Amino acid sequence: MYKRQVVEGLTAKYNQLRDASFTLHKGEILGVAGLDGSGRTELLETLFGYRTRQSGTIKKFNFGFRAAQGGTPEDYSMEVHDINGTQVGEEISNLSPNSAIKQGFALVTEERRATGIFGILDIRANTVIANLKNYKLGKFPLLSDAKMARDTDRMIEAMHIKTPSQRQQIKNLSGGNQQKVIFGRWMLTNPDVLLLDDPTRGIDVGAKYEIYELIQSLAKQGKSIIMVSSEMPELLGTCNRILVMSAGQIAGEYVPTGDGKVDQEKILELAAKNL
């Protein structure tokens, strides 16, 4: 079933994010570029409900019934309307991180050590912490230790996490392995949309390429990804489209041409548009 997300007029209450509108398709990697302080992180955090939204909407659309009539969703216009001309779509509240998770969103934060991991807890706790409801034993306030152990082992294997034990404190892992634990945590929630804020920041080259491969694999599985990055080559090499932010607003959208020099110049022009 083909899906897409449409964000319209998203404005945050306590930061500079203003009137952000864009479309995100199923299986797409959408980049977000911009200078420091341009509102990139604020965009992701507002989408996730971590920051207070003042106005704007997030809607889910489903194109399955259109594709069934012949052709693919791309063959049709970008908007679907009912017989009265009103746009059809399921509005998503995302007024808190908890509601965003229930709606299929996941956020990998920029500051891994400060807001991503729980340093004194072990790998198992860090892996299952966003999905604890699935480990409850009936009506009792107890968790299934065996199920948590199985899921953690599965994520360690799937993410190629290097650790002597799932009981190892996560603070003792390398930055790359810590980041892979965070990705594994969110995979257990089976998200539709992944919000990635500088996901390869502060990790070694080998781990970076593993993260790139993981992102591409998730997109092929139909996950929709919004990725902020401070590294232009990373965005150009990974993303289908790139939103460029300037002074809290989306200044434009760019589709990489394959000419790195030209692409970077065009993106920098947009990044300075509202300064």
Residues covered by each model-derived region:
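Glycine-rich phosphate-binding loops of nucleotide-dependent enzymes
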Residues: 3-275
